[in-house]
Every structure is written in C-alpha cells, then in structure tokens.
Amino acid sequence: SDPDRPVTQGGTDPTKGMKTDYQKKFNYLDIIGFNGNGEEIGELEHFHKNYPTLCAIATEVPHTYQTRGVYRSQTQWRRRDFPAPWEKGNINWEQFKHRVFPIPDLTEKECFPEESDYPYYQSSYDNASVRISARKSWQRTCSFPWLMGEFRWGSFDYLGEAEWPQRCGNFGIIDIAAIPKDAYFLYQSLWTDKPMVHLLPHWTHPGKEGKTIPVVIYTNCDAVELFINNVSLGSKPYTGEQLIWLVPYSPGKIEARGIKKGKIVATDCYQSAEAPHSVALASNKYSVKAGSDEVIRIEIDITDKNGIPCPYASNELSFHVSGPLRLLGVDNGNPTDMFPYQQPHCRCFRGKCVVLLQSDEEKGKGTLTVQGTKLVEKKLIIEVI
C-alpha cells in the first residue's frame, strides 16, 4: 500500500469481494472506482447504502456514443441496436433494459432514416448509449456528495476496440481527427463560466422541407431564444438540462441567442448550404520556427459559393506541400475509413478533414495547396522563421 496518497481502482463491480472480505479490501483501497456497472440504475446507491463511510469515483462512466455530424431522432442502445463483438448473442435486451436510465425518443418516427445506411455511425443527440446519457450521468454525479467525479469513456476517439469495418469506436467527445463533436459543447456548458450557446443539428437538410427536426441547445445562460430566418420561435429558461424545440424545417438561417440578465451574451447559428464549391482553411498557426517539433494543424471545410460549410460533403481532396514544410498526416474523423495517414489526399467526412504539417530546417515561406474535383483551389502560406 501507499501511505502517502489515497489508492483507488477501476472495476466493473468493485463491491464484489468486499461483501465477504470487506476489511482486507478496505486496507488497500481508499476510494472505490466504478466502471461500466456504475452506470446502472441503483448500483451506486446500493454501494453507498452498504458502505456509507467510503467514497467512490466513477472511473469509466459514462459510455456514450457519437459520430460527428450524424443525427438520429430515436434512441439507440448498444446492446439492443449495435452490440459490441463480446455482446453478440450473450445479452438479452429484455432482461437488461430495466437496468438502464431511460432516454426518450425525440420524435415518434425517425427524422433521419437515411442514416440507417451507416450502421457504424451513432447519433450526436446524446441518445446513443450503453446504459445512461452523458447529461443524466453528470446530474447523478453532482447529486451524490460521496461520489468524487466521473471519468467518461472516452474523451477522444481512439484506434482499436472496434470491429471491421471500423478502425475506432465512437466513444469520444472529440473525434479521431481532433474535431469536437456536439457532446464536447455539452460539457463546456456544464463546466465553463464564459457565456456560451451550442446549437444542433446543422441546418442543411435537403428534401426535409416541412418535416419536424429536433433542435437541441446546450448553454449556461439564463435563457435561450431561437430564431428561424429572423422569426422568433420563443425563448426557454435554462434549468440545467438541454433545451429542445421541434422545428418544421425551412432552409435558411437558424440562430440561438443566449440571454443573461436580459442581455444577449452568446449566439450560435447555422445557414443552409448549397452545392460544394470551394474549401476553407483554418490553421492553428501561421508561422513556426525552422526545425521545430511544433505541429501545424489545418482544419478544412468544404463550402458552398457563399462560404457556408457543407455538412454532408464527401469530396476527395489532394494536398501539395512546397517550401520548408513536410506533410505529417491527414485524417477526416470517419471511424470506417482505413486510408494511410501519410498519403497526400483524403476524402472529407461530413464536410471536414484535417492536415498536419511540420517545418524543415530551412527558413522561408511554405505553402499548402488544396485541390478537389470541381472545387476552387486554395493555398495557405506558413512562414518558417
């Protein structure tokens, strides 16, 4: 044992073994860590009832899924709808469903039936999970003074623990290309004091005119007012949960305005996109020292002729690097793409991809040129100093 620091562990059911050998286990563990089973209804309460003097931490909680840019209005449970390899044939959903926290469907009928063509992608409405939503998990963590916190699984998407044709699962709140998913902004609304509003989904839904789309907002403001094409759909007070509007789709602009003490303090908006026309390049830095190990990260969006991002675009892009720069890798965040990271081309996923560069030993101007079929070519200059 370590006399200087509290000792913990992550366990599927850490109370097993304590029931008959409590004192021995307590000699080694100061804080009891709960993995997946800690997400189930009544599990943590049962622990606290039996061991009221011990504190706990959720070491692998919650397990929720999202694929960036993908939405489904009806709830999906992993064990029922997309079982992991080790669950296939081993789990009877009817016997398991009473142990999960309910996540109501957002609509009676699926708003995005076309997404059924992509069974390895999960919805970004916080309605694809193993046992509990991210929202409910945090509410529960906050309500138990003897529960120190939670470490969600996972923070980033990661290679492995997935079945062909996937290279990674969809556990993260940031995808494998380091692009935030919607859940990232849920946690931001819970943990930051800076006023913020996040709106989902995007507002490019061709063929769905007049059909009801669930619009979800995360915020830390007092209230949010929603607008479609500058017409107010009303405001709703924030009470610690997500805000939901059911909105008949009409192309144009959707905007959420966060209000504190009667003033607009944060906004978020989307504009309906037309056909892909060009690319937009955004770099984390525009100058770098020669021979540096710094990484230049360039996020690329497919845009229409008005510069509006195209959220369904899947154009193939090619990258040419000249001057004192070299290509480190490319990625698009798609969990089912198996391309080599070092190749100088990439198919965008849900309108985006990322290019990573690094400087050579020489000084001068380096250039990244991005090209795509029927797209306007773009160049980005990086000063190597």
Stretches found by the model and what they are:
Residues H277-L281, F319-T336:
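Short aromatic-acidic-glycine turn motif
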Residues H205-G210, S287-I296:
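Short, solvent-exposed loop/linker segments at the N-terminal edge
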